[in-house]
Amino acid sequence: MSKGIPDRAQVVIVGGGIIGASVAYHLTKRGISDVLVLEQGQLTGGTTWHAAGLVSQLKSTYSLTKLATYSARLFEELETETDQATGYRTPGSISVAADRERWEELKRGISMASTVGVEIREIEMDELSEFWPLVKTDDLVGALYIPDDGVTSPVDTTMALIKGARNG
């Protein structure tokens, strides 16, 4: 054992990326304080360091959409809670369909995501062009807009989750 690492803990989490940090954060929020996060190098040194940090709320299933919506709300509040910068902001997102099959899939997504409380709507091609002036719209079938989709710094958000876990 390395010096300073306890020989036991109620919960041991292997991996100090955003997933491990989130597990630690949520366990401590539920009253489990004896949590140990192990990382082979430094926190966020693996996959998290390379992640894009996109926070999209429209997912393939109701459960995943609900989880993604929870995550977006958490990221929105985390910086204030922990006084740790996360880089979270909400520029919104656009999804486009180039064929009828994809457009039907997106319309089902609009219906499903609306039941979870995601602000989501279909947009016309002229509005799409306002958002994205260089887009070629004549071969598109449809588009949707989610104004509260965001982006975060995965490294900073991980550190905020760790700080939140330490604070309990």
Task: For each feature predicted by the language model, list its residue ranges.
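Beta1/beta-strand and adjacent pyrophosphate-binding region of the FAD-binding site
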Residues: 3-19, 36
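Glycine-rich FAD pyrophosphate-binding loop
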Residues: 28-48
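Short, flexible hinge/linker loops that cap or flank conserved catalytic cores
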Residues: 3-6, 29, 88
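Helical element adjacent to the flavin cofactor pocket in flavoenzyme catalytic cores
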Residues: 144-168
